[in-house]
Amino acid sequence: MGQTVTTPLSLTLDHWKDVERTAHNQSVDVKKRRWVTFCSVEWPTFNVGWPQDGTFNRDIITQVKIKVFSPGPHGHPDQVPYIVTWEALAFDPPPWVKPFVHPKPPLPPSAPSLLPEPPLSTSPRSSLYPALTPSLGAKPKPQVLPDSGGPLIDLLTEDPPPYRDPGPPPSDRDRDDGEAAPAGEAPDPSPMASRLRGRRELPVADSTTSQAFPLRSGGNGQLQYWPFSSSDLYNWKNNNPSFSEDPGKLTALIESVLLTHQPTWDDCQQLLGTLLTGEEKQRVLLEARKAVRGEDGRPTQLPNEINDAFPLERPDWDYNTQRGRNHLVLYRQLLLAGLQNAGRSPTNLAKVKGITQGPNESPSAFLERLKEAYRRYTPYDPEDPGQETNVSMSFIWQSAPDIGRKLERLEDLKSKTLGDLVREAEKIFNKRETPEEREERIKRETEEKEERRRAEDEQKEKERDRRRHREMSKLLATVVSGQKQDRQGGERRRPQLDKDQCAYCKEKGHWAKDCPKKPRGPRGPRPQTSLLALDDQGGRGQEPPPEPRITLKVGGQPVTFLVDTGAQHSVLTQNPGPLSDKSAWVQGATGGKRYRWTTDRKVHLATGKVTHSFLHVPDCPYPLLGRDLLTKLNAQIHFEGSGAQVVGPRGQPLQVLTLNIEDEYRLHETSKEPDVSLGSTWLSDFPQAWAETGGMGLAVRQAPLIIPLKATSTPVSIKQYPMSQEARLGIKPHIQRLLDQGILVPCQSPWNTPLLPVKKPGTNDYRPVQDLREVNKRVEDIHPTVPNPYNLLSGLPPSHQWYTVLDLKDAFFCLRLHPTSQPLFAFEWRDPEMGISGQLTWTRLPQGFKNSPTLFDEALHRDLAGFRIQHPDLILLQYVDDLLLAATSELDCQQGTRALLQTLGDLGYRASAKKAQICQKQVKYLGYLLKEGQRWLTEARKETVMGQPIPKTPRQLREFLGTAGFCRLWIPGFAEMAAPLYPLTKTGTLFNWGPDQQKAFQEIKQALLTAPALGLPDLTKPFELFVDEKQGYAKGVLTQKLGPWRRPVAYLSKKLDPVAAGWPPCLRMVAAIAVLTKDAGKLTMGQPLVILAPHAVEALVKQPPDRWLSNARMTHYQALLLDTDRVQFGPVVALNPATLLPLPEEGLQHDCLDILAEAHGTRSDLMDQPLPDADHTWYTDGSSFLQEGQRKAGAAVTTETEVIWARALPAGTSAQRAELIALTQALKMAEGKKLNVYTDSRYAFATAHIHGEIYRRRGLLTSEGKEIKNKDEILALLKALFLPKRLSIIHCPGHQKGNSAEARGNRMADQAAREVATRETPETSTLLIENSTPYTHEHFHYTVTDTKDLTKLGATYDSAKKYWVYQGKPVMPDQFTFELLDFLHQLTHLSFSKTKALLERSPSPYYMLNRDRTLKNITETCKACAQVNASKSAVKQGTRVRGHRPGTHWEIDFTEVKPGLYGYKYLLVFVDTFSGWIEAFPTKKETAKVVTKKLLEEIFPRFGMPQVLGTDNGPAFVSKVSQTVADLLGIDWKLHCAYRPQSSGQVERMNRTIKETLTKLTLATGSRDWVLLLPLALYRARNTPGPHGLTPYEILYGAPPPLVNFPDPDMTRVTNSPSLQAHLQALYLVQHEVWRPLAAAYQEQLDRPVVPHPYRVGDTVWVRRHQTKNLEPRWKGPYTVLLTTPTALKVDGISAWVHAAHVKAATTSPARTAWKVQRSQNPLKIRLSREPS
């Protein structure tokens, strides 16, 4: 037996468990495959001597580790865990590694022990000192490090042994080498020594003293080793933070240990291993090795120098020599440098900025925290004088607001040092008022403010009453004087005054009381008017009586009316809205004037129901309640001592409600039970709990909230949107109220978001809404913990039927915001009246912030936790700010409500008294109506759904389904009912609303009207789930027992996925139960569930058939349904389809396992064993392989010795498709016979026996809802299975080497398939499906009309072959011709001429009867073409510069495609002007970057670098980026004429062609996915003949387009495919025979250009107006032509050039010209002038 060679790599693989354990100890994870790859492939390439079989050499491992840990792009971070694990195996080897680890070389013997010389003096900047020499009289200690071969150490001895074996005393030469510096001369300090933190110089200890350091002098004068005690290491590790948390503190600790303990190399490793993690230690060692400096004082990269100064393995330093001690000192210095460099975290000034002074934090303590932040998060030293300015600014800006503001106002701030700022801050801090003083001051200011406001209100009220009394007195005096004048008759009246005219001086602009001409002397006692002097006993005497007033609600706003029985009509003073054309004259004290009535009828409710309109009189001093409205209200006015009271006929105060006329019908509805109003005792007993009495709330137990931002977020500033004056005035009172309450405060912030005024429906009131979408994007997301309303009521037992519902008012405003987070929510506001012009921000949690609901919900849960503990018998449900309290009795509900209100008041929350529902048996909560342990849909919810109109767009349909989906628990079978609606919501689907959709729409609405009541889930009782399945839809009802009845809890329904929908009924029931059980779990909360269904599915779940279910689905169903602690199966029941509840009679029993066993493929007698009496035994095979870079495929049907059928398949055909085609062909050829067919394809065998039927049942869809591959071939195979009389499909192994019949037949079929794929060239056809039956002569059926037409043509009938022959070809009947041409047109939508040209280029093997007539009829009647094609326009054809060969001259343009899809909105179109070849790329933007990207990545690699590019003057083409790229590449970029699309005619025409084709394809396919249809449009454009009869495909590739090649019935006659050389020769001929004539034709057009326009200089033309107005001529002018170009004209009177297409000739009528002769001063000259006719 041979021996196996063991290598380090194989050794680790044999002990892989130990390797993984070692990796886990290093906090890393390794994989075996990558372990082998790195060891054998990666690390040998590092050129450090790593063998492919691995090694445990520590030096080589260290070199590899350095390579792996290299910073920047040369490092290998993915290999770090593997080299760290390998290093751990080498440095701490397990038993199976130790034999492979290289032993350490023995330490050289040291010199004899003598007193060491005094150590060299260190640099003043150094903080590390050599070991101290002890005195000679030191007591010897027992040994610590024994000899490797000696006995065990006696730890109880007194003195330790020396650290190294004693050696001979150093000679002079040794002293010169190791201690070269003289005794009195200190060596140069190392570069690292000057950089260490320690800068204090300690005196050199006396050689006679001894200290308890790890290296200390022994009794023999040598340095002895004292190890660290375990207690010291334990204390250091546990009393200090980790290196990752606070590297500075741990670095200072290690520095002090290095200074005081003088540790050796081994001690340093022990210290690092204890205080640092493995990863931190590796990072420190790597940084220390980087700090090693060479002889020139710069960091070196030489490995030998780095290993000498900072070795990774134990060095052989002799600490009794000066050389060894110097090495140790340098090692400690480098170690400290590594600690400092590794501890430097990346600069994060945001962390520094986040340090702010606390409310009660002293300035000195804050400064220390600020400096510590600078040390931790920046590389700057805060003690550095150069950083003092930055620290000072941070100290000022991040101090408390009051301290920061005062520090900013200090004089000569620049000259202040940090110490001066701290002293000033301390003074300000010490002068702060105490909390008690602050509360007292705020209370005093509040009282003073309230007192001032109260006094002002009283003064205003007194002034208002005085003014009203004075006006009423004037009115009554006027009435009295008028009556007196009427009685006197002959007395002259005073002249009538205007409303702004003075009654004293008759001047306008002031009244008599303000008249400057009126004497102001002391007034005498006024005589009392007899009419007003009332001699009443015990009355008011001469005091004015109180005016009768009543406050009514008009239009939702309270209006206080003055009851005036003398007024005929009621009056409003403010504008109530639009006014009608109806008006009336009103006679007042100052004269008469016409006023208008209100437009809208108003409906008032008092004791009765009345309709009324008001008179709008703005000049009236007070709104008046006249006799018209008082009469309708049956009002009664009582005069009492306290004043007049206006009541109804029953003595109750009048309550008036105003609403629009369109809501008048609601007044005639039947009255409902009156709601129990909130009693006054609840308001008075708990004033702090209500928003109406307690004011704005404040959660006293919640700390201010800090809103964390994302790491990369920056402030966003969005300007305020324009706001109308009406909206600004509407939200102004709200802003003022929030400012007075302190919820809004002025601020200055870099953040700003706009304010949106939202008008409340039905009123003129606005409310401010802030657009915080940009702020939400920049704030960290938190997990939402708001309860799900779907199952929130599951925690409400039906036994609790007394409810209290509270809605917290302004809930979010109860939580405070931290001052650091307040600037995030700033917005702009200007109010000149209040003196505000700047920003305001929120001091409370704002609305519109994405995390507000979660933050408030959690805060309220914490505050109400105590209430829940104290009242365990009550049920308290909380959904954000909506509270539901439930109890079993009215008394418990009242007591619990009182306790809850008291708790809310104490906590600082406020409830809305208007929305409160106190101790009722029927309440509304979260859109549900709760009553007697059941939940109902509210009428408002039903009306919302019923009021929605028929959807017109997918968005409206989604809104309807979302609203109705909220109510799906009340609708049995909602998923099945809404099935016709969901396909219309998909993107890219045509919205075609048909009868099915209308029926589903109405059924959902009808189901809502009959929605039943659902019981609340009782978690103390088990649940029953009745499940049924129908046509792929799962339906069920979740019930609970209520006495002898079953009460529904929820109706569940869901559509099964495409895979489950294709199963047999029994398995579909299993899927339905699984789906509904999962949904029911949201309501049952894990309580026991009994499943009842018409199928016995428990046995199916326990033993599911592997034919139908995958392992993953089987495991899922079993884990969900076989949980016996939660799910149980009941007996089989028959369900009522309407109610889904069990019927009283039993249903038909069946065995699901037996039915599934009988469920076979489409043919029940299909066998997989050979038939003994078969007529044929055939072998099929399909082959697909790569040859010369092209995938070739073929299929064959053979016997053991001969080929029955063989065909080459199109290039790219897969092997699975070829196998299906071969098997299908064999079945077709064996029609009506007994057949044994062998196939070596498991795919074809399984499809025929098992999977084909499964695919058919589920609609040939995958689990993702997409079509399966080879759909058409599978359908053809399933259809062909029924053709043979008897059939057996047998699977045989492929590529057998035996001599059996199966092996020979299989080899024959495989060889035939490969040969036919190599020998024959399949004809490409996109018009006919590969597996469809081609037209043959036997399928031709001629009609009488066909026979007549053929007789006229002179065709002959072949009676033997049974078809007509004309021109030597079989004649295709008219119907066949129509079907073929119609199918061709549906694919291409080419015109009549283009399609005819294609058919004539490559004649068909058949003669198509009436081809031209049929084709013309098809193209003319095509609906898609008629909707898209533009009408013809007679435009003269011009000439265009083209390239001389393909790929040299391109035209480029962007065209927009609507609607956008997947973000793509544009098409970038490239057209080769020579060949007409088109390239089009969907793009998301229309930029120069997109143009250059496609040009360099698509055009250049495939067609070469263009020479000329032609574009319009779009921004993407004239930009500097595009032009610069063109200049660098040497491309001549030609910009076409502006506003002239014809100059880019070729690409513009192609844009139209693409859009038309895409439109036709979307109409034909019903899909809106134009990105998916774009390749078909490009295929059509590339294969359409051009002006010269050649297609772009032919010009470019030299081959006929694949569109015109129809399949020949006899495929065996196809010639062999040409070789590569023949193809190249054909291309060469194309270049000479096609490209050169085309180039010559293009050049000939250029040589003979067409005259672009007939206009010449001097002609008169009209110029078109581009924008015409109403009744304005379309043409302007005429103008005279001054200059011309081939495309434009310069005319007199217009500065710009005018395109020739925008002008037309002006015809002038001949006019008779008259000339006049005049003399001049020169007798030899005369003047001729033309007179106008």
From Swiss-Prot:
Residues 432-464, 484-496 have a biased composition (Basic and acidic residues). A motif (LYPX(n)L motif) lies at residues 128-132. Residues 112-196, 202-221, 432-496, 511-550 are annotated as: Disordered. Residues 559-629 form the Peptidase A2 domain. Residues 739-930 form the Reverse transcriptase domain. Mg(2+) 1 binds at D807, D881, D882. Its cofactor is Mg(2+). Residues 428-433 are annotated as: Interaction with host UBE2I. It catalyses: DNA(n) + a 2'-deoxyribonucleoside 5'-triphosphate = DNA(n+1) + diphosphate; Endonucleolytic cleavage to 5'-phosphomonoester. A lipid is attached at G2 (N-myristoyl glycine). The keyword Nucleotidyltransferase applies. Keywords: Aspartyl protease, Capsid protein, Coiled coil, DNA integration, DNA recombination, DNA-binding, DNA-directed DNA polymerase, Endonuclease, Eukaryotic host gene expression shutoff by virus, Eukaryotic host translation shutoff by virus, Host cell membrane, Host cytoplasm, Host endosome, Host gene expression shutoff by virus, Host membrane, Host-virus interaction, Hydrolase, Lipoprotein, Magnesium, Membrane, Metal-binding, Myristate, Nuclease, Nucleotidyltransferase, Phosphoprotein, Protease, RNA-binding, RNA-directed DNA polymerase, Transferase, Ubl conjugation, Viral genome integration, Viral matrix protein, Viral nucleoprotein, Virion, Virus entry into host cell, Zinc, Zinc-finger. One of its GO terms (molecular function) is RNA-directed DNA polymerase activity. Mg(2+) 2 binds at D1181, E1219, D1240, D1310. Its EC number is 3.4.23.-, 2.7.7.49, 2.7.7.7, 3.1.26.4. PROSITE patterns: ASP_PROT_RETROV (PS50175), ASP_PROTEASE (PS00141), INTEGRASE (PS50994), RNASE_H_1 (PS50879), RT_POL (PS50878), ZF_CCHC (PS50158). Mg(2+) 3 binds at D1453, D1512. It holds the Pfam family RVT_1. This is Gag-Pol polyprotein. The gene is gag-pol.
